[in-house]
Each structure stands twice: as C-alpha cells, then as structure tokens.
A protein has these predicted regions:
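C-terminal hydrophobic helical "lid"/dimerization subdomain
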Residues: 1, 281-328
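N-terminal Rossmann-like NAD(P) cofactor-binding module of classical short-chain dehydrogenase/reductase
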Residues: 96, 228-229, 251
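NAD(P)H dinucleotide-binding glycine-rich loop of Rossmann-like/cofactor-binding domains
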Residues: 83-84, 94-164
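Short amphipathic alpha-helix with an adjacent loop that forms part of the alpha/beta core around
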Residues: 211-223
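Short, charged beta-turn/beta-strand-edge "cap" motif at the junction between a beta-strand
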Residues: 39-40, 79, 99-111, 192, ...
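Glycine-rich phosphate-binding loop and adjacent beta-alpha segment
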Residues: 104, 234-294, 325-328
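Mid-domain Rossmann-like dinucleotide-binding core that forms the NAD(H)/NADP(H) cofactor-binding site
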Residues: 134-209
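Glycine-rich beta-strand-centered segment in the early N-terminal region that forms part
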Residues: 22-39, 52-101
C-alpha cells in the first residue's frame, strides 16, 4: 500500500511516498480503516523537523499525519462486527478521528490501524466532496475544546482574545468561546481575512494594518481581557501578558511554550492537553453538522504532494486546513 514515511529529521524533502508499505494488523481494541483523506497540522512539520518534543519519542522510519477520514474495514480481535455495529462503527461506515496522544504512528497511509475510541461516524448525509472538512476536524476540534473548556475555563461574561483567528484551530476557538458564554471575542488575523473572522462571530484585529495591543487597550479601556487563546505564541505570548485582566488566564497552544514569564507575574497560564474521547468527537460531529463549527479547508492536495503541503504549513499563514486526498 502507499504511505508517507521519513527516515531522518529535516525539511519537507525528507518525506517520501512508498508504494510497498505493509498493511497493519489491528490490535484487539483497534479498527482497520481505509483512509480517504488526511488532515495536516503544524504539529506534523514540527515532528518531521525534530523541533517537537514528540520527535524524541519517534522511531525512524516513521509516518506522518495525526488525523484522517476513511471507511471501516474490520475490527481487531475484541471487536467483531456486532460490537463494531453497537458503536456505530460497522464495516463500511465512514469515520473520522485522530491518533490519541502517545500513538505516534502516522495517518498518511492507505490503510491504518487506529483505536476504536478515537473514531466517530461521519453523518450519512455528508457528500464525498465534503470529507476533507471531516478529515481536518479531529485534532483542531479536540485542541479547541481542551483550550476553551479545560485550560481557559471560559464562562459567561468572559472577554476573549484569540491570536490567529483564521487558522485551523482559531476557526474553532472563536465559536467555542462564544458557545461557552464569552461576551466578546476579538481575533487577530490579516486584513484580508477580517470578514472571515466576523463570520465566525468575533471582532477582527488586522495585525498587518493596526497595532493589536493598542486596539485591545482601547477596546477594553485599559482593563485587558479575561482570556487569551494564543495559537502563535512566539511573537504574541509576552506582549499578551500586559493585556490580561485581573484574574485572567492565558492559554498558549504550542506544547513547548515556556509559562515562566506568566507565572512570575501571577498570571494563570495553562497549556491544553488533548483528550481524545468518543464523547468529544461526537460533540464535533454535532457542531459541524449544525454549522456551529464552520471549519474551512484552504487546499486539498494529492498524497504525492506531501512535501508541498508541509511547505505551506511551515509558511504559517494558511487559512483553515490543508488536507491530503488519497484518491486524487
């Protein structure tokens, strides 16, 4: 079968499409899935180039990708067809999901074995051409839930600033913060993406045309915001600390973020930890199905263009998600 592998850390050029990868055998609580689409995320290029802490846990050669959509083939030893059916995962069912933390096997392969609890059925009415959105949903969706609900604990009346409002995670942080009761959400992004931020329910701050710090200061009369959800971190974390209201929280999404500057100032800072559960995946199904989580896919590329996809990820200005189509 075809799969993406890399045998050393480095740039996008280390990614290779192999055509003779062995088909995996599912463990007892795993499901074998025929993959149709793979969602890509900045974490993928950070693992590939060795900068993520997860890279030290990787055995090379390794695969790439954390999330996917596809069709159930069969279950492992403890998951016969009846048991799969009781979970809504009968053979032939279209599903989406992601690798749980600690499972570093890639998803960019024609067939993968993946934990049954890390999958949820795609609604039957979803057309095939809509599957890229589902392939790109799990990681950003579960990250956003962990950031808003677990780390920031956004609640009624909170004011929220999202750094990176039109990235994959940012497009879900905004509606989830509003869903949690936020009274006002501002989101930074390029001026060209201001309308998209408005559509998501936030007030845009065009960082390429105005000073976001001055704008937040003006909009909050110098009080600052209750919560900062920071998908950028490197250029935004430290200055954000000057715009946190008393008792406020800052949530940087990069897992290697240094929280010391915040804690030294008595500001609550928490890095979200993704929890992969069927309950949370089903919440994403409802949100996407009902239009509450309008995740955008910017590009769909064939598997053979994996290096190009990683180049786009590294550029850092991707709007929405980049998805691989294994049938293209």
């Amino acid at each position: 079968m075809r799969a993406i592998v890399f045998d050393r850390f480095g740039g996008p050029e280390v990614l290779t499409v192999v055509t003779d990868a062995p088909e995996p055998e599912p463990a007892s609580e795993e499901v074998l899935v025929q993959v149709s689409h793979v969602g890509l995320n900045p974490l993928d290029h950070k693992i590939r180039d060795g900068s993520s802490r997860l890279a030290s846990q990787l055995e090379l050669p390794a695969g790439t990708g954390r999330e996917m959509a596809g069709t159930v083939i069969r279950g492992g030893a403890d998951l016969d067809d009846a048991e799969l059916g009781s979970r809504g995962l009968a053979p032939g069912t279209r599903v989406f999901g992601m690798r749980p933390p600690g499972d570093l096997r890639g998803t960019a392969a024609e067939v993968i074995a993946i934990a049954a609890d890390a999958l949820s059925p795609v609604p039957t009415e979803v057309m095939h051409e809509e599957l890229p959105r589902w392939a790109g949903l799990a990681l950003v969706g579960l990250t956003a839930i962990s950031a808003v609900d677990d780390a920031a604990k956004v609640s009624g009346g909170d004011t929220v600033l999202v750094h990176g409002g039109t990235g994959g995670v940012g497009q879900l942080l905004i509606p989830m913060a509003l869903e949690a009761g936020a009274s006002q959400v501002w989101a930074t992004g390029r001026a060209a993406n201001a309308q998209r931020i408005r559509e998501l329910g936030a007030t845009p701050i065009a960082y390429d045309e105005e000073d976001w710090e001055e704008e937040i200061d003006r909009a909050t009369a110098g009080r600052g915001v209750d919560v900062v959800l920071d998908t950028h971190y490197h250029s935004t974390f430290l200055p954000s600390l000057d715009h946190i209201a008393p008792g406020g929280r800052v949530v940087p999404l990069p897992t290697l973020a240094d929280l010391t500057p915040a804690t030294e100032r008595g500001i609550t800072a928490v890095i979200p930890e993704i929890t992969v559960t069927r309950e949370r995946l089903d919440r994403l199904v409802i949100g996407l199905r009902e239009g509450h989580y309008p995740l955008e896919v910017s590009q769909v590329l064939p598997l053979e263009q994996i290096s190009r996809a990683h180049e786009l990820l590294e550029g850092g200005h991707t709007r929405g998600k980049i998805v691989l189509d294994l049938d293209a």
